[in-house]
């Protein structure tokens, strides 16, 4: 028995001794290989990579089949002659600066990839197209700072479908941070019921995005989500959203009207800062707090409607004239419409007393009178300017045949 055990150990010794850990080139691709763990990671190559690179799902080294599981830090960075890369479904991570400043033109990222390291695709200004398997996997990927390839890509494909008008289906509950960061091919996004949250920077600088429609299942949106979406002109917020966070819609310079639903009780710092074309704002009745410079530098502002019986307060303990929510928006030339019994409260509040004209909401605006659909006398529009056959629940724009226009809230 003892002799048999010694013989078994002797057989195992050469195998252990031959285990390899280090860098080696196989079929033109450099890898970090660990034969003991039977895995390999694509690594940087002297002089960089050229042309089309198809990464295999596995390689053989020293008689061991090793699965290719990752693209290491800086692997393809500064590869000035690189064109296309196909990544196998065995790869789960793409490392920090993996493709940074390369001349990559197209890349396929499989659903197996769970993370993109910081600056993974930074400076890839030759990138034409990105292709992924499905939205479910793409919306769940963890994307580091300045790592999203879509900020450079002209085309984004889910399967064989190019995405310009995006629908986030009910099968996706969370859209992770930076998922569509900087994608200039995106023109509209609609969220179906079932989506609950949108991460920070998710649609940051999508400069051609014109329309955003949120389902009422969304209860959280992060910071800087729609920052500098400079073409955004149609916005429908979730009726279950409790707050709008810091810089969420900052520099959405085309947005002209805004309806803040009753569910929202707080608006964060610079949430709508520099929305330079914003003319009309309607705040629901539950708003309690507005942050620093939330609506600053909105120089076209003419009318603000607040349905809160108690005037919302400034979100910070200390303030100066330049940090108040409407600083730089010339509120002294705008009209604030508030509940009649609350006028004195608003006049005493530093957030609101800066308005040059504070008036009572009319009965129609308060929804006391019913709006009748008489097509020969009135035209009814939604807040985003679409015509409606009848007044709908919530806010309506009603234009009478005599030229008078008013905003009406229907309960």
Located regions from the model:
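N-terminal signal peptide c-region/cleavage motif recognized by signal peptidases
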Residues: 14-16
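Boundary of Sec targeting at the N-terminus
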Residues: 19-21
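Residue-level detector of functionally pivotal "anchor" positions at catalytic/ligand-binding pockets or at interdomain
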Residues: 361-384
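Structural signature of tandem-repeat unit edges
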Residues: 35, 48-70, 80-93, 101-115, ...
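Consensus positions within tandem repeat domains that build extended binding/scaffold surfaces
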Residues: 72-75, 95-98, 117-120, 145, ...
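Short, surface-exposed loop/turn motifs with a glycine/proline- and acidic-biased composition
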Residues: 61, 382-402
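C-terminal tail/sorting-segment detector
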Residues: 1-3, 395-411
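Short, conserved loop/helix-junction motifs that constitute active-site signature segments
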Residues: 298, 318-332
């Amino acid at each position: 028995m003892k002799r048999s055990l010694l013989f078994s150990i002797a057989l195992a010794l050469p195998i252990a001794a031959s285990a390899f850990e280090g860098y080696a080139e196989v079929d033109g691709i450099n890898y970090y290989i660990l034969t003991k763990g039977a895995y390999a990671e694509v690594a940087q190559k002297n002089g960089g990579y050229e042309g089309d690179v198809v990464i295999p799902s596995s390689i053989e080294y020293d008689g061991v089949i090793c699965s290719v599981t990752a693209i290491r830090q800086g692997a393809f960075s500064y590869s000035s002659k690189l064109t296309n890369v196909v990544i196998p479904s065995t790869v789960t991570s793409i490392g920090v600066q993996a493709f940074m400043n390369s001349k990559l033109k197209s890349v396929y990222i499989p659903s197996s990839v769970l993370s993109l390291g910081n600056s993974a695709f930074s400076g890839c200004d030759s990138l034409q197209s990105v292709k992924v398997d499905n939205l479910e996997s793409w919306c769940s990927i963890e994307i580091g700072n300045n790592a999203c390839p879509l900020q450079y890509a002209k085309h984004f494909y889910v399967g064989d479908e190019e995405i310009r008008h995006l629908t986030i289906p009910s099968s996706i509950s969370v859209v992770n941070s930076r998922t569509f960061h900087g994608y200039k091919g995106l023109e509209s996004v609609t969220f179906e019921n079932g989506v609950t949250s949108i991460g920070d920077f998710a649609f940051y600088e999508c400069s051609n995005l014109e329309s955003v429609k949120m389902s009422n299942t969304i209860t959280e949106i992060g910071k800087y989500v729609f920052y500098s979406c400079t073409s955004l002109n149609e916005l429908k917020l979730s009726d279950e959203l409790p707050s709008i966070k810091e810089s969420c819609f900052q520099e959405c310079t085309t947005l002209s009207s805004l309806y803040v639903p009753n569910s929202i009780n707080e608006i964060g710092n610079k949430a709508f800062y520099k929305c330079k074309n914003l003319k009309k704002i309607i705040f629901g009745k539950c708003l309690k707090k507005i942050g620093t410079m939330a609506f600053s530098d909105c120089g076209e502002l003419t009318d603000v409607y607040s349905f809160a019986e108690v005037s919302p307060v400034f979100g910070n303990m200390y303030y100066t004239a330049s940090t108040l929510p409407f600083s730089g928006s010339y509120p002294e030339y705008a009209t604030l419409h508030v509940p009649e019994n609350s006028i004195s409260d608003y006049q005493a509040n530093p957030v609101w007393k800066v308005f040059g004209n504070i008036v009572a909401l009319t009965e129609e605006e308060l929804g006391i009178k019913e709006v009748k659909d008489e097509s020969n006398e009135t035209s009814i529009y939604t807040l985003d300017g679409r015509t409606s056959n009848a007044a709908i629940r919530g806010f309506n724009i009603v234009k009478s045949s005599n030229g008078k226009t008013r905003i009406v809230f229907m309960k």
